Regions:
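Feature captures hydrophobic
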Residues: 1-166
């Protein structure tokens, strides 16, 4: 059995995506977010939000052995040495940027690791904007007065954070 086990090939193989291609996908990601949301309002929420929403996100790309910091409000995408929130393959980050359902899919398939305390929750507060958009919830002035939606979002975020701490 040892020989058979050693002969097994890895099930999940990822393609390495070069950093320049990821950067191009990020530009499309920014355009998609900005076309569905009031970016000025997103900036205001980011500045005054008690839950630290829409902050820059730091991801370590395992196969490229670099960390990137991105901010769809400022449209910035840079390499960094700051502590990452999550770690994943370059193909997974590129998938998030190319698909409006990308982060949702990643949370289901689990192709990432949390590398800092509360890293997943912090990343979710930034990346979940497209999950909301896919549900027909855009960040616009009228959304601020839709208290059931705000309550739903905060309740789900709290549940996820509580489960991760357990």
């Amino acid at each position: 059995w040892d020989k058979k086990y050693q002969a097994l090939k890895p099930i999940a193989l990822f393609e390495t995506v070069e950093i320049n291609e990821i950067r191009q996908s990020f530009e499309l990601y920014c355009k998609r977010i900005q076309s569905n949301n009031n970016i000025k309002l997103v900036q205001i929420i980011r500045a005054i939000s008690p839950i630290s929403a829409f902050k820059p996100c730091i991801i370590h790309l395992e196969d490229l052995d670099i960390s990137v910091k991105f901010d769809y409000i400022k449209k910035s995408f840079t390499e960094t040495t700051e502590q990452a929130m999550l770690s994943m393959q370059s193909e997974s980050l590129d998938f998030i940027f190319k698909n409006s359902f990308g982060f949702d899919t990643l949370t289901v398939n689990g192709c990432f690791e949390e590398v800092s305390k509360n890293g997943f929750v912090r990343a979710t507060k930034t990346l979940a904007i497209e999950n909301l958009n896919n549900l027909g919830i855009n960040i616009e002035l009228k959304t601020l007065f839709n208290f059931p939606i705000i309550k739903l979002f905060l309740t789900r975020l709290y549940r996820v954070a509580r489960k991760l701490d357990a």
